[in-house]
Regions:
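Divalent metal-coordination and catalytic microenvironments
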Residues: 6, 19, 23, 34, ...
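Active-site gating loops and adjacent loop-to-helix segments of metal-dependent hydrolytic enzymes
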Residues: 50-84, 174-185, 209, 257-264
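Short, well-structured alpha-helical segments that form the helix of a local strand-helix-strand
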Residues: 84-86, 266-277, 289-293
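Active-site core of metal-dependent hydrolases
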Residues: 130-244, 262-263
Length: 325
């Protein structure tokens, strides 16, 4: 079995299809085209637990009022069925052909356990939060911010002892001091909307990756300097952030990015969506993310003659997903 159509790779579209058995790219195929083929997307930052809050979201709340430590979001989380909310978010993830989700999980070990028996054919990386006396429930740490979390250094140390990842929000609503972040040296930082050029230079020198969430940022009137990050050669990923603000659909995200960041090439946007945080993942040479043939594929309907324009055209739909081996 195979899909016939142009296949997106790091160097552009190539080949004439993919094998659905081995996931390998096929150079020559007979027959009519099935569509345009791209690797599974990577959603590098989500909060799926508040997905169902989208229907109840109050208007005109500030960033702090909505997602701060005492904000509306946390009151909603305490009063609602989070498992149903996560399932709703995962349906959006699956429908858009997303093979990797990196979810910041509130609620300590109990929050992580909400994922334990859920059916998702892709890979979930859960980044836990402190709860009670337990600083780090499992191996990965998702720190809200250095300002909000007093024990961030100890949390990061525990994560590294367990070979886990450390992620943290920074400079989302205003510029924050970069020095404590560099001292913490997380694997990746989320947002950086108000970071200075010097901040980005220090991030690059420290080998820290960056995840950008353009739709979520735009909700609060923020805009990450994505063009600057790309020009510096930073390791970048895209995320959809809070489910209460935006769908967890990566196709929606990249089509928004195209409109908001019109100077970026479609190849660059699609590359980040499909191969985001590659440098971070490939620090571990055993990572399957370094092997394109193990990444899985999405078949999109052909909406335009140009392959890139077709992917970004709202009329193009997901026809099928070949999940990772």
């Amino acid at each position: 079995m195979f899909w016939k159509g142009p296949v997106f790779t790091k160097t552009g579209f190539k080949g004439q299809g993919v094998s659905l058995e081995s996931c390998e790219i096929i150079e020559t195929l007979d027959g009519e085209e099935d569509g345009v083929i791209v690797p599974l997307f990577r959603n590098c930052h989500t909060h799926l637990g508040d997905s169902l809050a989208r229907k109840e979201l109050p208007k005109k709340l500030s960033l702090t009022e909505l997602v701060g430590p005492s904000g509306w979001k946390h009151k909603w989380l305490a009063e609602n069925d989070l498992k149903s909310s996560i399932i709703h978010g995962l349906k959006e993830v699956i429908s858009s052909g997303t093979g990797l989700v990196m979810d910041f999980r509130e609620g300590g070990e109990a929050g992580l356990q909400l994922f334990d028996d859920l059916e998702y054919p892709g890979t979930v990386i859960l980044l836990g939060r402190p709860e009670g006396n337990k600083l780090l429930p499992r191996e990965n740490a998702g720190i809200s911010s250095i300002i909000d979390v007093e024990n961030s250094k100890e949390i990061a140390r525990l994560a590294r002892e367990r070979n886990g990842l450390v992620g943290i929000h920074h400079s989302e609503g205003c510029r924050e001091n970069i020095e404590p972040l560099i001292d913490l040296c997380p694997d990746f930082v989320v947002h950086m909307c108000h970071a200075s050029d010097n901040d980005f230079e220090k991030i690059k020198d420290a080998g820290i990756s960056v995840v950008v969430c353009p739709r979520s940022n735009a909700y609060f009137g923020n805009r990450a300097p994505l063009e600057k990050m790309i020009s510096l050669g930073l390791d970048i990923g895209f995320g959809t952030d809070n489910g209460m603000l935006c769908s967890a659909n990566m196709i929606d995200e990249i089509r928004f990015i195209r409109k908001e960041f019109g100077d970026l090439s479609l190849h660059t946007i699609l590359s980040i969506a499909c191969f985001g945080l590659d440098d971070m993942f490939n620090k571990d040479r055993t990572s399957t993310y370094s092997n394109l043939e193990q990444s899985g594929w999405i078949l999109l309907s052909r909406a335009e003659e140009n392959e890139y324009e077709s992917v970004f055209n709202p009329k193009s739909e997901v026809l099928g997903v070949r999940w990772r081996n």
